[in-house]
Curated annotation (Swiss-Prot):
Xref: InterPro entries: GPCR_Rhodpsn (IPR000276), GPCR_Rhodpsn_7TM (IPR017452), Olfact_rcpt (IPR000725)
Protein name, UniProt field: Olfactory receptor 1M1
Tissue/organ expression: Expressed in testis.
Cytoplasmic topological intervals: 47-54, 119-142, 218-244, 293-313
Species assigned in the record: Mus musculus
GO cellular component, one term: plasma membrane
Bilayer topology term: Multi-pass membrane protein
Length: 313
C-alpha cells in the first residue's frame, strides 16, 4: 500500500458564489453596492451616536458597538470576494485563510452576544423602568460589551489553534467565497473529531444560549406589555422592541440554519446563501432597521448629513 501524501496545502482556491464566469459582473456590482451601503450606513450610525449627547444612553451604546461589529464582519469577507472576482485570482494562502476565519468567528460571536445584550437592555427598560438607570450603569454596560470582546477573542483563537493542527492533502478547492470552518474541515485528511465537537460546543454557547436568553427576555417583556391597560401604551412599549426583533429574526434565522442543523440537510449552496445573509445582507439592513423607526436616531443622522452638506457648500 502506498503511503498517503500528507503535505499540507499552502493555499486554497475559493470557488466563490458561482463557478460560472458569466455571473461575475452581476455579482461584483451587487456586492460592491451592498458593501458601500453597509459601510456608509453603519459609520453614520456610529457618528450620529458619538456626536449627539442625547444618544449617550445604554441602548445606543450597544447599537454603536453592533454597527462597528457589522462593519467589520462585512469588511472581513466582502472586499476579498470582490478582489477575487475582479482579478479572477481565487487563491488565498493558508495563513490568510486562518486569519480571515479568525476574524469571521470573532465578529460573528460578538454580533450574537451583542444582540442578546440588547434584548436584556429592552427587558430592563420595559420591565423595570424606574430602576433602569441604576441597573444599566456605565460599569455594567462596559462589562456587557467588554467581556464579549475578550470571550470572542478566546473562542476564535481556540478555533484557529485546533485548525492549525490539521493536515490538508489533495483537493484544495473551497466551495465558498471566504474561509469558513465547515468547508475547511471537509477538506482535511486527518481526524477532525475534536474540531467538530468544539464547533458544537461553541454553537451552543454563542448561538443557542444567547437565543434562549433573548426568548426569555421577550417572554418577560410580553407579559409586562400585556399588563399595560391602554392599547396605545402597549403599542408604544412594543414599538421600542420591533427593530430589535427584526434583527434577531435576520441574524439567528440564518446562523441557526448553518451551525445547529444536522450536516445531512446542509449543502454548499445553502451554506453560501446563509453566509451571504449574515455577512452581507444583515450588516447592510441593520442601520435601516434601527433608524427608520427611531426619531431620535433619524434626527441625529439628519444633523450629520446637513452639517456635511453645509460644510461642502
Amino acid at each position: 500500500m502506498e503511503p498517503q501524501n500528507h503535505t499540507s496545502a499552502s493555499e486554497f482556491i475559493l470557488l466563490g458564489l458561482s463557478e460560472k464566469p458569466d455571473h461575475d459582473p452581476v455579482l461584483f456590482s451587487l456586492f460592491l453596492c451592498m458593501y458601500m451601503i453597509t459601510v456608509v450606513g453603519n459609520l453614520l450610525i456610529i457618528l450620529a451616536i458619538s456626536f449627539d449627547s442625547h444618544l449617550h444612553t445604554p441602548m445606543y451604546f450597544f447599537l454603536a458597538n453592533l454597527s462597528l461589529v457589522d462593519f467589520c464582519l462585512a469588511t472581513n469577507t466582502v472586499p476579498k470576494m470582490l478582489v477575487n472576482i475582479q482579478t479572477r485570482n481565487k487563491s488565498i494562502s493558508y495563513p490568510c485563510c486562518l486569519t480571515q476565519m479568525y476574524f469571521f468567528h470573532f465578529f460573528g460571536i460578538m454580533d450574537s452576544v451583542l444582540i442578546a445584550v440588547m434584548a436584556y437592555d429592552r427587558f430592563v427598560a420595559i420591565c423595570h423602568p424606574l430602576h433602569y438607570s441604576t441597573i444599566m450603569s456605565p460599569r455594567l454596560c462596559g462589562l456587557l460589551v467588554g467581556v464579549p470582546w475578550v470571550y470572542s477573542c478566546f473562542i476564535s483563537l481556540t478555533h484557529i489553534l485546533l485548525m492549525a493542527r490539521l493536515v490538508f492533502c489533495g483537493k484544495n478547492e473551497l466551495p465558498h467565497y471566504f474561509c469558513d470552518l465547515t468547508p475547511l474541515l471537509r477538506l482535511s485528511c486527518t481526524d477532525t473529531t475534536v474540531n467538530k465537537i468544539f464547533v458544537l460546543i461553541v454553537a451552543g454557547m454563542v448561538i443557542a444560549t444567547p437565543f434562549v436568553c433573548i426568548l426569555a427576555s421577550y417572554a418577560r417583556i410580553i407579559v409586562a406589555i400585556m399588563k399595560v391597560p391602554s392599547a396605545g401604551g402597549r403599542k408604544k412599549a412594543f414599538s421600542t422592541c420591533s427593530s430589535h426583533l427584526s434583527v434577531v429574526a435576520l441574524f439567528y434565522g440564518t446562523t441557526i440554519g448553518v451551525y445547529l442543523c444536522p450536516s445531512s440537510v446542509r449543502t454548499a449552496v445553502k451554506e453560501k446563501a446563509s453566509a451571504v445573509m449574515y455577512t452581507a445582507v444583515t450588516p447592510m439592513l441593520n442601520p435601516f432597521i434601527y433608524s427608520l423607526r427611531n426619531r431620535d436616531l433619524k434626527g441625529a443622522l439628519k444633523k450629520i448629513i446637513n452639517r456635511k452638506i453645509s460644510t461642502s457648500s
